[in-house]
Amino acid sequence: MKSLPEKLIDSIEVRGEFFNEGKIEEELEEIANLCKENGWKLFYSVPQELFNQEGFNQDIENKILIAEKYNISNLKYSLGHIDIRNTNFNKLNDILNNTSVNVTIENQPNANGTLVEMKKAINYLSDNHIKLGYTFDSGNWYWINENPHVAFDELKDNISVYHLKDIKNKNTMMLNDGNTDWKYMLNELDQNIPIFLEYGIDKDKVVDEMEKVEEVLMKR
């Protein structure tokens, strides 16, 4: 991360599964200090589902405490499956309303992440005033044979964080080499929505990929 071009970055997102399990807080502290030095916001991708058959993920309180300690702005979870009967939404909302940390759910590449299920979940959470944002992953739709452009058009008003990928034949490509009309999506997004490049990039191509995005954003 120390080699990243400071001028093109507002925020970074780290993935929980990439941390050394015995040194998570030690590594987070180092990353948080780097973010502070560069004026970057820090986002954290939790490798867990927020909802399951027993209700909501009880570990969220622990993750929020860690986020507050290391100045993490946003925690992202996979949606999972909402079981309305077993979920204490009042308790969940109390947790979410008593922190400055934003929490988002993401469309995952399985049966819980289809457009039908995402719309159902987002509408239910919105109707019941549950303080959860939505991370739109532009690539995950391909793995479940759904159209990311249709999904984007139907969900764009709910998006609070955007994960950018370009996909071809279910392989992640460099931008402009896949089938995703990512420029259209960026132009349709609210200008305050953070955009993350969420795919493997060779070190010598990182700046090129970021500059492709910057070129589009500067013309909005």
Q: What are the functions of these language-model segments?
A:
Residues S100-K120:
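Conserved anion-binding
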Residues E21-E29, I82-L92:
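Active-site-adjacent beta->alpha loops and helix N-cap segments on the catalytic face
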Residues R15-F19, S45-F51, L79-I82, E106-N110, ...:
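Active-site beta-loop-alpha junctions enriched in small/polar residues
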Residues I60-F89:
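Hydrophobic alpha-helical segments and helix pairs
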Residues M1-D10, E26, A32, G39, ...:
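Histidine-acidic metal/acid-base catalytic patches
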Residues Q53-F56, G113:
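Conserved glycine-rich "GG(E/T)P / GGGxP" loop and the immediately following alpha-helix
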Residues L8-K23:
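N-terminal substrate-binding region of glycoside hydrolase catalytic domains
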